[in-house]
Regions:
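Helix-enriched interaction subdomains in cytosolic or periplasmic regions
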Residues: 1-10, 87, 103-110
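Short beta-strand segments enriched in small/hydrophobic residues
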Residues: 31-40
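Short beta-strand elements in bilobed, periplasmic/extracellular small-molecule ligand-binding domains
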Residues: 56-70, 184-188
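Anion-binding alpha/beta catalytic cores of soluble intermediary-metabolism enzymes, centered on
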Residues: 92-156, 160, 174
């Protein structure tokens, strides 16, 4: 019989844990701060940004917004990312993608330091996932899958796991993270 693993209790537990961590940091004079970097006014980005602001507010993370117009240049965006990288008061960065066509996605991603890349989009963050090192962060969806399994105490060691899709943002990182937990992983794709 199948067991449904609901996300809501996982989110509630993580929010409680993160709020406590934020309070501990604030007691030491550190205000956890997230940079949100957005180019343009796409409605889906705006909606996602509102959700980010709400979630950060619930756990005590400050948000610093960097908004560029849709016709911004790559140089302008790279300057913003340099500011984020060098500001010790900013602890993480969420760069909204996809970027408008005038941007070279690879160059922009490479400009963000992995230790501030909370979305796991930089090559450095992915290298951390694939080499099992503490460089950067795992992509959020892949990390969420593992968090859900851990919350429900799903044993992974020695088990067979199937991952549908092999994208760099979900499938491959999820497969590597499951492999790290000693699961035998099969990747499935449409080919």
């Amino acid at each position: 019989m199948a067991t449904i693993l609901k996300g809501a209790p996982v989110v509630a537990a993580m929010n409680e844990r993160n709020a406590a961590l934020c309070e501990q940091l604030k007691a030491k004079g550190i205000t956890p701060t997230l940079a949100v970097v957005r180019v343009g006014e796409r409605e889906d980005d705006l909606s996602y940004e509102r959700g980010v602001m709400t979630r950060c507010g619930k756990v005590g993370v400050a948000v610093k917004q960097f908004v560029l117009p849709a016709d911004a240049t790559q140089e302008q965006l790279l300057r913003v990312l340099d500011e984020v990288n060098t500001d010790d008061g900013i602890h993480g960065c969420l760069l909204f993608r996809p970027l408008p066509k005038q941007f070279d996605d690879r160059t922009v991603r490479a400009a963000l330091r992995p230790e501030k890349d909370i979305d796991g989009i930089t090559d450095g963050s992915l290298a951390g996932v694939f080499t099992n090192t503490d460089l950067g962060y795992a992509p959020c969806t892949a990390q969420a899958c593992l968090e859900i399994l851990k919350y429900y105490n799903v044993p992974l060691s020695g088990k067979r796991a199937v991952v549908v899709g092999r994208s760099l943002v979900v499938g491959k990182p999820a497969a590597m993270m499951l492999d790290r937990e000693n699961a035998t992983v099969t990747l499935c794709n449409s080919r």
